[in-house]
């Protein structure tokens, strides 16, 4: 591929494979994590499959991605199927499969999604934008952790950076940072889905202990439409996340961008 293509666009590039809603993609090293691709780029590829589908109604409203197994390096196949289409909403089932050593397709990721036609009505928010310094005066933090996908994002932490001392001291799990794609790229639904998984595991900050952790399931709600995303351009987004419950080997977090 041409080097003029943004790494995100290379990573979510899908080729139709004949049957409607069937696509083939290829993992890239640009978004590689410890044992597979960064979870956000997998979510972005699923959003791309929906938007590329000839029967797609409207724009993404939400997507839930369940990471059943690590996606291996190489080819993968996506099936995106609209199971119900209403006047304003459309409901989707998606799977990602890869061949095993015998060549049999094995499910590695499942997802559900909703797309919708947005109509102008009353709107409001109960979550105010925090007062924080602009990204121009917050220094960029060099990539942390030694995995390639961290090089794909410009991160400028305000609060809750990854622990500098792993001493087991418990603290609040809130992280705030300015973040955007690196190199800069105009914001769209695929990029926003990718950004939604940018937060390191809350348990690391909460306990300051090196604990094996990975995303099992993520849900993204797209409250912004095409116009709002276009207005954001290539600028930074303020991102924040906080854990809510840590129990019996699992934990959650609530995040906003």
Predicted segment positions?
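Terminal targeting signals and extreme-terminal segments of soluble enzymes
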Residues: 1-257
């Amino acid at each position: 591929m041409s080097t003029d293509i943004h790494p995100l666009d290379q990573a979510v590039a899908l080729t139709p494979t004949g049957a409607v809603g069937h696509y083939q993609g290829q993992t890239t090293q640009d978004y590689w994590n410890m044992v597979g691709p960064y979870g956000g780029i997998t979510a972005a590829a699923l959003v791309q499959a929906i938007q590329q589908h000839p029967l797609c109604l409207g724009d993404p409203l939400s997507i839930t991605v369940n990471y059943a197994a690590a996606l291996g390096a190489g080819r993968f196949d996506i099936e995106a199927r609209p199971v119900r289409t209403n006047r304003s909403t459309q409901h989707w089932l998606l799977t990602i499969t890869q061949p095993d050593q015998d060549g049999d397709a094995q499910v590695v990721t499942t997802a559900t999604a909703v797309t919708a036609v947005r109509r102008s009505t009353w709107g409001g928010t109960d979550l105010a934008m925090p007062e924080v310094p602009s990204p121009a005066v917050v220094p960029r933090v060099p990539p942390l952790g030694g995995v390639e996908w961290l090089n794909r994002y410009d991160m400028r932490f305000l609060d809750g950076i990854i622990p500098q001392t792993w001493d087991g001291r418990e603290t609040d799990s809130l992280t705030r940072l300015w973040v955007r794609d690196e190199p800069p790229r105009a914001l769209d639904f695929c990029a926003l889905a990718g950004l939604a998984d940018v937060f390191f595991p809350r348990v690391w900050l909460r306990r300051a202990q090196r604990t094996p952790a990975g995303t099992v399931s993520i849900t993204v709600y797209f409250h912004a439409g095409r116009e709002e995303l276009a207005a954001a351009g290539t600028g930074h987004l303020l991102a924040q996340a906080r854990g809510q419950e840590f129990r019996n080997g699992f934990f959650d977090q609530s995040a906003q961008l």
